[in-house]
Amino acid sequence: MSIKQMPGRVLILLLLSVTGLLSGCASHNENASLLAKKQAQNISQNLPIKSAGYTLVLAQSSGTTVKMTIISESGTQTTQTPDAFLTSYQRQMCADPTVKLMITEGINYSITINDTRTGNQYQRKLDRTTCGIVKA
């Protein structure tokens, strides 16, 4: 597995492992908050996750949103710009059936990269619109 393939795959495997446990928990907005909280807790148990010069260091929930914070590793040459990394990460997550299910259940994702080299911050939000999920 190449480094470029790793960020989404690691997270997607985490998401797959909890889907069976959580699929009965989320019926709509009220339970979507609980689902987001559990999702963030499960991701947090496996942190840090490193890939391509970036490290996922934090996962937390806020309402129905799972917020993930990624930092660029200082002193390490990244293989992708933060924007390119986020685009690739978004594409991989949106293509995953488990992530699609979570989004369909009302969960949104907010992914932030804090670039320690430049001090810049990059952010992507994953929801029905950005992932192209048509409401049933």
Protein language model annotation of sequence segments:
Residues 2-12:
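Bacterial N-terminal signal peptides that target proteins for export
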Residues 10-15, 78-84, 115-121:
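Short, intrinsically disordered, charge-biased short linear motifs at domain edges
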Residues 21-24:
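C-terminal motif of bacterial Sec signal peptides marking the signal peptidase cleavage site
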Residues 26-29:
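Bacterial signal peptide processing site
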Residues 33-77, 102-136:
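Polar/charged, Gly/Pro-rich intrinsically disordered segments
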Residues 78-102:
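Short, non-transmembrane amphipathic alpha-helical segments
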